[in-house]
Amino acid sequence: MKIRHLLLLAGLVSAPAIVAAQQTALPSSSAAQASGDDDGGLTGSVSDESEWQDLGIAIPSFPTNASVPTAAEGGTTEALGRNVARVVFNDLKNNGLFKPVGPDALPAIAFPQVAAPAFDAWRGRSAEMLVQGFVKANEDGRLTVGCYLYDVALGSELARQGYVVKPEEWRRAAHKCADMVYSRLSGESPFFDSKIAYIAETGPKDRRRKQLAIMDSDGANHRFITNGQATALTPRYSPDYSQIVYLSYLNGAPRIYIYNIGTGQQKLVTSSTNPTFAPRWSPDGKWILYSMSVAGNTDIYRVSVNGGASTRLTDSPGIDVGGSYSPDGSRIVFESDRSGSQQLYVMNADGSNQKRISFFGGRAATPEWSPRGDQIAFTHLGGNFRIAVTDPSGGNMRFLTDSWQDEAPTWSPNGRIVQFFRTERGSGKTGIWQVDLTGRNERKLNTPVDGSDPAWGPVLP
């Protein structure tokens, strides 16, 4: 989308505000309608993945009722239909739960077949589930994208949704289609229609240029927010997606700023001249946790997003940083070296009842509480840097990655996937990676430059 203006003083560019994707009703298909509790013959769970990874899903190109020019990628509604199906295919392939087959390996279907599938033909291709849809140009210039999910074996319709979007927002319709399929088959909350903030890195490893950037969950629609004149670090989306809090060396010292996605404006979180860093949002979006160094001592503080006086939550002789709220806002996990090495601690939201939870050897840093509330992801330091998870009491710790230097985990909106950044040994090049909770499905996101400090935002409205 077109960048609207440049804020030279702050080194910022504005990001277009996200407009809610309008959902529209679709006509029912000729297939039998499955009941709401029909699981399509599946009995496994997302945690054990006993049969999910072998579930074959056919996703042919989305046809159009009439191929007409459109401002969307591809130039025509016919070409766009194939692109939409490709995005749906890639979303479902990359989450590690299913075995989809995309439009480039399947025959095209005619527009009338979208709501009247040829189930016998798809059974012959050993497809268990079928995703069909369409793209149609509206008189007002917008597009209607329809999405149907069918159980091939039962010959029934499991779900359907329609979306009305501007041509430049066509990828959102594709992600929402994939979300519908994923949620209906897995029982999990959606996460594809979301965005990621991260730090884009360029230059030699001893003089890295670090800019704030954002992109879709699959790496598309990339744009830089800051111009790189001042180093940016540790971004985090607000719970309503409207703002990003991050650390910037804009005036030479580490300070925390809140960037408004809709207006491109930013403001300081506190007026303190002391170094401030490691910002995190409260779940209700009313507070910012951050660390501040005063007279050589670093503690965790809380301040209203509207400014005002800060409240000190920790007061130890060590370095306390990296606070992350539990989903209900009642507790905070953070790292501290008060015991002599970096370890994980949990406290109540008011700073009371601080206790160490990491007793599994090595050091522990950069904790992030899962949106589900049942696990905490963190960086384990013990020879190398690995991403690990533990329950909030410090039990059931396990590693998700086994590389030289993986750090700074962030959760997908549904708590299903952990994203992090990996540094290559020797070159110092960094990249954004993600892994599911089994630790078996790992992949790298494509970014135009090196990337670090990822922050997965909420599902878009």
UniProtKB/Swiss-Prot annotation:
What are the protein's UniProt keywords?
Cell cycle, Cell division, Periplasm, Signal
From the Swiss-Prot or TrEMBL record, state where the protein is found. Answer: Periplasm
* A Gene Ontology BP annotation from the UniProt entry: cell division
Residue numbers spanned by region Disordered: 28-47
In the UniProt record, which is one GO cellular component term? periplasmic space
Q: Where does the record locate the signal sequence feature?
A: 1-20
Coiled-coil segments: none
Note the subunit structure: The Tol-Pal system is composed of five core proteins: the inner membrane proteins TolA, TolQ and TolR, the periplasmic protein TolB and the outer membrane protein Pal. They form a network linking the inner and outer membranes and the peptidoglycan layer.
Q: Which family does it belong to?
A: Belongs to the TolB family.
Q: Which HAMAP family match?
A: TolB
Stated role:
Part of the Tol-Pal system, which plays a role in outer membrane invagination during cell division and is important for maintaining outer membrane integrity.
What's this protein's name? Tol-Pal system protein TolB 2
